[in-house]
Amino acid sequence: MDQPVLLTGAGGRVGQAILGHIGDAYDWRLLDREPLSDEKIPDSVDSTEVYVADVTDETAVRNAMDGVHAVIHLAGDPRPEAPWDSVLRNNIDGTQQMFDAAVDVGVEKFAFASSNHAVGAYETTDRTPDMYRPHHEFRLDGTELPRPSNLYGVSKAAGETLGRYYHDHHDISVVNVRIGNLTQHHPPKEYERGQAMWLSYRDCGHLFECCIEADYDYEIVYGISDNDRKYYSIDRARAVLGYDPQDNSAEFTFEGEPLDEA
């Protein structure tokens, strides 16, 4: 791919998982509201391609966006307990600003980092904790309506809806990735819910690489590894994006140790 890929929120965990996997595979532009330390920037990325800016800054966003082919939009307030004024500014207004700039400069693909919190209220007391265990039949597949568990989840559902609007009215390809529980090296320890929605760094990088490479219109997919215990379906991500996850929380003990070492 000759044109750059813009990655917002590049210094966060998801951004670092992506860059750790495919940091040398693309011509990146990186944007974060905080200066990135050298270890967070791939060697192949020139300092002129690193932007320190807020996604609500229209001028900065458009400068960073100019000439890019694809956008991976991660930036925002990631706190589940974030108050409304913060999610409104950073997650909703900021995402709208990103979409608006993207269509103005002719971006072809836009991958939006949604969240499990956009559907967290499906985890009702009559379903939990059984739904976190292997062989339970309950599945969310991306066709269900949002059911947020907090205001952060509301903001992510709003981002998905913004994507629907911009796809329908401006023909930009949009994929919303409802990210599960991203941890490095091993699944969350002694946490059934986290192990059911575990996303490894390796699979995270691969999934967003698929978002850059695949052809799609408007999609909602789940971002988890191929866990035995799961209540999110990854069938759509496999079929549309070519996602082929390699990791499985069942390959670790409940305490997070690899089974072949336990």
From Swiss-Prot:
pH dependence as annotated: Optimum pH is 8.5.
Top-level class of the enzyme under EC nomenclature: oxidoreductase
Catalytic activity: D-glucose 6-phosphate + NAD(+) = 6-phospho-D-glucono-1,5-lactone + NADH + H(+)
Gene3D superfamilies named among the record's database cross-references: NAD(P)-binding Rossmann-like Domain
Disruption outcome: Deletion mutants do not grow on glucose.
Active site: Y152 (proton acceptor)
Enzyme Commission number: 1.1.1.388
Residues at which NAD(+) binds: N90, S115, Y152, K156
Entry similarity comment: Belongs to the NAD(P)-dependent epimerase/dehydratase family.
Protein name as annotated: NAD-dependent glucose-6-phosphate dehydrogenase
Naturally occurring in which organism (per UniProt): Haloferax volcanii (strain ATCC 29605 / DSM 3757 / JCM 8879 / NBRC 14742 / NCIMB 2012 / VKM B-1768 / DS2)
